[in-house]
Amino acid sequence: MNISDPIADMLTRVRNASRARHTEVIVPASRTKREIARILVTEGFIAGVTEERQGPTQILRLTLKYVDGKAPVVSGLKRISKPGLRVYARKTDIPRVLGGLGIVIVSTSQGIMTGAQARKAQLGGEVLAYVW
């Protein structure tokens, strides 16, 4: 099956799995998804990520995180820049999510990073997603 927006597919899988209280979710691997997963682990939204081979394809196994084993830590994920409508932000225009309670994932010339890291490095780029 051909997926037109693999990043949106990954975010939707994580959102659906966390709402269904699953302990882990499997997504097809790519370099971009690996970087997004790394950011989610670093920022404390998911517990861990492992890369595995499943037949001929690489997969990422994301271990989800819950508050007191009940409420998911990830309360929301939103894809911003889409294949049909790309959204870019200058270094001064990178948005803040929920007044700083969430994160922005930005694709810059130096790689994929959070909005705070992009502001600190004075880099703009494509706004991939909001996570809160």
Feature map (PLM): residue ranges:
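Core subunits and conserved enzymes of cellular information-processing
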Residues: 1-132
